[in-house]
Amino acid sequence: MLAAPLPSFSTDAFDQVVMSTYGRFPITLVRGEGCRVWDDQGRSYLDFVAGIATCTLGHAHPALVETVSRQMQTLHHVSNLYYIPQQGALAQWLVAHSCGDRVFFCNSGAEANEAAIKLARKYAHTVRHIANPIIITAQASFHGRTLATITATGQPKYQKYFDPLVPGFAYVPYNDLGALEALVASLDQPQPQVAAILLEPLQGEGGVRPGDRAYFEQVRQLCTEKGILLIFDEVQVGMGRTGSLWGYETLGVEPDIFTSAKGLAGGVPIGAMIAKEFCAVFQPGDHASTFGGNPLATAAALTVCETLEKENLLENVRDRGQQLRTGLQELAAAYPQVIAEVRGWGLINGLELQPDTPLTAAEVVKAALAEGLLLVPAGPKVVRFVPPLIVSATEIDMALGAMSRALAHLAA
């Protein structure tokens, strides 16, 4: 494989010209293959970040490399004013493998959630005749960085300094049916105002907190009884990461609308909003995306979808996820003064630190980095493990070994 030419730059020069929106770790990654990446000094790392649950097939997967290379040589972008075969084929696959009927393509999870919010509002106005629709979301949720999606996000730290926020959102504790029922009853007086309930099947950025099956079943019943749309944000958990293709399948509850992005095209930018026919009320001019559904991104995504099936990756996710959780639970037993809980589904798992330990998730991530393992925080006290779905049993064992060494160093 030919290596891409590497621009010559220093991290100091980088920091002088790139806006400071990230707190970066002090390594420069230049190459990847499978579940490994290499820095500019030639050191390799086991990648359990995967671009934050994005590199579904790992790095430089032959099928994805071949598809993207071929598509770039053929046709990489045209306007949605024309029919795009790859887009149609991907939409067909998504509809055939989900509860949805119609697909809107965009470029990211935030854009997909924006599309879902707009669709829910239009449905509320045109079908239910709600003048001022309200969408309920969960506290500690995360739905994106645009103005509407940070408003939907139930974490004030993401909203600070961006007032005035978008009106029409309300918040309840996650997995708390009583609080949700009370809020709906309050908002729907004297007439209905609740247009939709937007939830993550598992809260990712909020600390890797799985949804409670009984709670979601009752939320589904509530929405059906009142005509409220149920929207699932599947951006981080969808495309096989939970061990099912979609997080809603893990819960056994179907939404009316759901969103996908991150892992859908294995690292090529894409987003999708999938809706059931009855609420797919968009008409020409209601919404659009210049790059959404372009031939390159949709060809890549279709290859990811087909590879999930061909390589039986859902079974691998379930097996390797159980192996990882078992190993993390053993580490929790060995370091009870540090680790409070291990939780997750499939290959999205969180290790929560004890509330009284001075250690932060960022410090644990830095210690793991020194041992050649890339991890990512999910809040101040939770370390997140989201490796590529192709991860092997040997690589899980190596990651657990690196974590053991990191914890031993921190506990010393």
UniProtKB/Swiss-Prot annotation:
Its main location: cytoplasm. GO terms for biological process: L-arginine biosynthetic process. GO terms for molecular function: identical protein binding; N2-acetyl-L-ornithine:2-oxoglutarate 5-aminotransferase activity; pyridoxal phosphate binding. N(2)-acetyl-L-ornithine binds at R145, S289. Binds 1 pyridoxal phosphate per subunit. Pathway: Amino-acid biosynthesis; L-arginine biosynthesis; N(2)-acetyl-L-ornithine from L-glutamate: step 4/4. GO terms for cellular component: cytoplasm. Pyridoxal 5'-phosphate binds at G109, A110, F142, D233, E234, V235, Q236, T290. Keywords: Amino-acid biosynthesis, Aminotransferase, Arginine biosynthesis, Cytoplasm, Pyridoxal phosphate, Transferase. The modification N6-(pyridoxal phosphate)lysine is found at K262. It is an enzyme of class 2 (transferase). Its cofactor is pyridoxal 5'-phosphate. It holds the Pfam family Aminotran_3. It is found in: Cytoplasm. PROSITE patterns: AA_TRANSFER_CLASS_3. Its EC number is 2.6.1.11. It comes from the Bacteria. It catalyses: N(2)-acetyl-L-ornithine + 2-oxoglutarate = N-acetyl-L-glutamate 5-semialdehyde + L-glutamate. Homodimer. Belongs to the class-III pyridoxal-phosphate-dependent aminotransferase family. ArgD subfamily. HAMAP family: ArgD_aminotrans_3. May also have succinyldiaminopimelate aminotransferase activity, thus carrying out the corresponding step in lysine biosynthesis. This is Acetylornithine aminotransferase. The gene is argD.
